[in-house]
Every structure is written in structure tokens, then in C-alpha cells.
Amino acid sequence: MSRYRGPRFKKIRRLGALPGLTNKRPRAGSDLRNQSRSGKKSQYRIRLEEKQKLRFHYGLTERQLLKYVRIAGKAKGSTGQVLLQLLEMRLDNILFRLGMAPTIPGARQLVNHRHILVNGRIVDIPSYRCKPRDTIAARDEQKSKVLIQNSLDSSPHEELPNHLTLQPFQYKGLVNQIIDSKWVGLKINELLVVEYYSRQT
């Protein structure tokens, strides 16, 4: 299944706020109206919606998300927590969380168009897994800096997660450590996502 490119507001009206997909918010009470219209949700639908929430927020294809779930399942620790860490440490998501891109699709475009350096080298793979002590910066070109400055100027200036440091005047961010789960930028029950996939096999 390909990456979603359809109407974004339609998704947030059904699934709730998805800040990685769009900075728009559903109108207050719209989720309650949808719920009353559709009646009581089945357990399958609840798990499906949590999976969709994760997929659309991080801008993943179905195949990509399944791959991350399998990697997380083989790692030590809680599969759900490891899954969120893997997704949060993607380069496109790090750029978004730093405020250097307005959304994750916007961050992906910056990376694809070779505007971004990791540790001084161009990285054009949005799924690149960032590590502690990585430095993420704009290329030393006017166009790259303008794109990032525009995003920094329009970002909502929310509190930065403690695993990241932003140096806005240098168009640069630092990864201090692996993300703590309490700083994940999405209201999600990751265990339901893991359950969804475990029941598909």
C-alpha cells in the first residue's frame, strides 16, 4: 500500500490530531459526533485506527510500518516502546520535531532534495536512523537556509523534547539521546498497534 497523499483534514477528522501529517486540528467535538454516528467500535476497529494513526502521522506505507514492527519485535524491551523510538529517530521526524520542517512530508521533501546534512554529509534518505550525538544541519546554501528559516519562523515554538537541542542561528539541531517515550509527539496506544499486527499473522 502506498503512502497516503489524499485530503489530510479527512484523516484528522476521523483519527484526531496528526501533527506529523498536518498542523491543522479537528474541530472540537467532531470526533464525538463521528463516534455517535458510527456506534460502538469493535476491538478490531480500535486497533486498526491506532495503527492508521501511527501510519499517517509518520507518513509511512503499510509495508514500512510492518517492517518497523518486526524490527521492534526482535529487539530487547517493550515492542511498542521500541517501535515508537524507531519511528521518532527517523531523520524526517527529527527535522519536524526540531521545527526545521512544518510537517513530516515537508521534512521528507527537504531530505529528498538534498538540503540536509547529517554530521557534515548530505543524507537524502528520509528514513535514515539518527543516533545520539548526530548533528543535523542545513546545507551551506542560501536556498536550504531560507527553507528552514521559514519553517522555524512559522513553527508554534512548543517545548523541544529533551533528546534534541536546536541551534536556530546556525540552522542546526543535535540529537542528545534516544527519545524517552513521554516525549513522543502523538497521543497513541502503541500496544494496540502491536496487537493489530500480531493478529494478522
Curated annotation (Swiss-Prot):
Every S4 RNA-binding domain range: 89-150
rRNA-binding among keywords: yes
CDD domains the record matches: S4
Main function: One of the primary rRNA binding proteins, it binds directly to 16S rRNA where it nucleates assembly of the body of the 30S subunit.
A Pfam family assignment: Ribosomal_S4
The family this protein is said to belong to: Belongs to the universal ribosomal protein uS4 family.
An example Gene Ontology CC term for this record: chloroplast
Localization annotation: Plastid, Chloroplast
Main location: plastid
Region (Disordered) residue spans: 15-44
Single GO biological process annotation from the record: translation
Identification of the protein by name: Small ribosomal subunit protein uS4c
Higher taxonomy: Eukaryota, Viridiplantae, Streptophyta, Embryophyta, Tracheophyta
SUPFAM superfamilies from the UniProt entry: Alpha-L RNA-binding motif
Gene encoding the protein: rps4
Subunit structure: Part of the 30S ribosomal subunit. Contacts protein S5. The interaction surface between S4 and S5 is involved in control of translational fidelity.
Alphabetically ordered keywords of this record: Chloroplast, Plastid, Ribonucleoprotein, Ribosomal protein, RNA-binding, rRNA-binding
Keyword Cell division: no
Superkingdom of origin organism: Eukaryota
GO MF, one example: structural constituent of ribosome
